[in-house]
Amino acid sequence: MARNKIALIGAGQIGGTLAHLAGLKELGDIVLFDIAEGTPQGKALDLAESAPVDGFNAHLSGANDYSAIEGADVVIVTAGVPRKPGMSRDDLLGINLKVMESVGAGIKTYAKDAFVICITNPLDAMVWALQKASGLPPQKVVGMAGVLDSARFRYFLSDEFKVSVEDVTAFVLGGHGDDMVPLLRYSTVAGIPLPDLVKIGWTTQEKLDAIVKRTRGGGGEIVNLLKTGSAFYAPAASAIAMAESYLKDKRRVLPVAAQLNGEYGVDKLYVGVPVVIGANGVEKVVEITLDDAEKELFKKSVASVQGLVEACKTINPAFA
């Protein structure tokens, strides 16, 4: 039986980490693609030479031509530029929109049956543009944000309660930005909802509010510490969890940026919600009940995403 094929578009920090994790988990053969000549080839060779030590079997290759991704089962997109000091939102949108056009065209030509995971920021707008540019069915194109944001939320909660991260469940709704909505009511420690843990004196509402605030700024906190880039270990691990659920038909319930078609009162926008990921991509959108306060926060988050999408349409009317 042929191995699965995983194409990684962008061979930067996240791309290299994705390749390493995919190899360690033996998810399939791996192609690293980048426009920078030598970079994907060098990283692929370096990782291939680690296989005998780590004991994994996967063929790794690097390429500068989209034909190398032909027949990929999964495509993970990290290509694009990060926001730099002095760069406006529209500057970033304009540059990365062009990248999504080119990546989308490559996927359309060579990997039209793939499950596509977008990591490029601003995430919710870029995954929307990538789906448009690739022409793939919306259930086969998703954005990686909620898994990462939820992981950060879970880590901060486990640190607060001094318990294993395995016993903390939490998820985040909405866009991947300052308006994301970490849901305290639906987050638990060993099955006990956070509001109940406040009642029994394990923590305070003030501490939970501080954790929510830190979760919203989680990416920025790492950027400020690194000074030369942004997070890559946790984003890569998050995307691999999504890819693995698809490839192995695990049907995990994961928060991802998925296209909504009326769910949560949202139409034709990519927004972070819990979904079931299986062999068909997004198998189901899980629509949970929100209270009035949560609805308002979610609505604000959706409005931010809508603003980014409208800006994309203004920059390039072909996306309208």
Curated annotation (Swiss-Prot):
The keyword NAD applies. Keywords: NAD, Oxidoreductase, Tricarboxylic acid cycle. Pfam families: Ldh_1_C (PF02866), Ldh_1_N (PF00056). It catalyses: (S)-malate + NAD(+) = oxaloacetate + NADH + H(+). NAD(+) binds at residues 10-15, 34, 96, 119-121. Substrate binds at residues 83, 89, 121, 152. InterPro entries: L-lactate/malate_DH, Lactate/malate_DH_C, Lactate/malate_DH_N, Lactate_DH/Glyco_Ohase_4_C, Malate_DH_type3, NAD(P)-bd_dom_sf. It is an enzyme of class 1 (oxidoreductase). GO terms for molecular function: L-lactate dehydrogenase activity; L-malate dehydrogenase (NAD+) activity. The active site is at 176 (proton acceptor). CDD domains: LDH-like_MDH. GO terms for biological process: lactate metabolic process; tricarboxylic acid cycle. Gene3D superfamilies: Lactate dehydrogenase/glycoside hydrolase, family 4, C-terminal (3.90.110.10), NAD(P)-binding Rossmann-like Domain (3.40.50.720). It comes from the Bacteria. Coiled coil: none annotated. Its EC number is 1.1.1.37. Belongs to the LDH/MDH superfamily. MDH type 3 family. Catalyzes the reversible oxidation of malate to oxaloacetate. This is Malate dehydrogenase. The gene is mdh.
